[in-house]
């Protein structure tokens, strides 16, 4: 193994939960970038309360920034996983996902869960990306 396949790049979004729980917003190893479960928050406070589309937009902007900080972009995303507290929000969430990924078309899963840390969060999204060449 060489340095490019073993070097870990940790990306923080500044979430107050990162040091408490011990996680990174994203991790890059070689040409793989994994973005952890991302919710619509700013400074630890929920945004887009009651609006799953607004939350999805905020989440995907956070994910795009994390990817950028890891030397990747949305065009490198190969998989997303979307978790909803109410599956009835699938279309509103899906339409925003389509705005960001319409031409990229990663594989995607959408699941209903019982809840998140904050009851104001309606959506959480994870993303995996593959960058053609290591360039960090």
Q: Can you name each region flagged by the protein language model?
A:
Residues 1-61, 65-78, 84-136:
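N-terminal presequence-like segments and the immediate start of the first folded domain
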């Amino acid at each position: 193994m060489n340095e490019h396949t073993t070097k870990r790049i940790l990306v923080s979004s500044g979430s107050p939960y990162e040091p408490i729980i011990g996680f990174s917003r994203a991790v890059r190893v070689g040409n793989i970038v994994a973005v952890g479960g991302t919710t619509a928050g700013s400074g630890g406070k929920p945004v887009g309360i009651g609006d799953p589309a607004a939350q999805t937009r905020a989440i995907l902007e956070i994910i795009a920034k994390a990817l950028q900080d890891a030397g990747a972009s949305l065009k490198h995303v190969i998989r997303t996983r979307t978790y909803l507290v109410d599956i009835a929000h699938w279309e509103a969430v899906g339409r925003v996902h389509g705005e960001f990924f319409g031409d990229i078309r990663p594989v995607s899963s959408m699941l209903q869960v019982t809840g998140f840390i904050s009851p104001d969060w309606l959506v959480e999204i994870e993303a995996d990306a593959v960058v053609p060449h290591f360039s960090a």
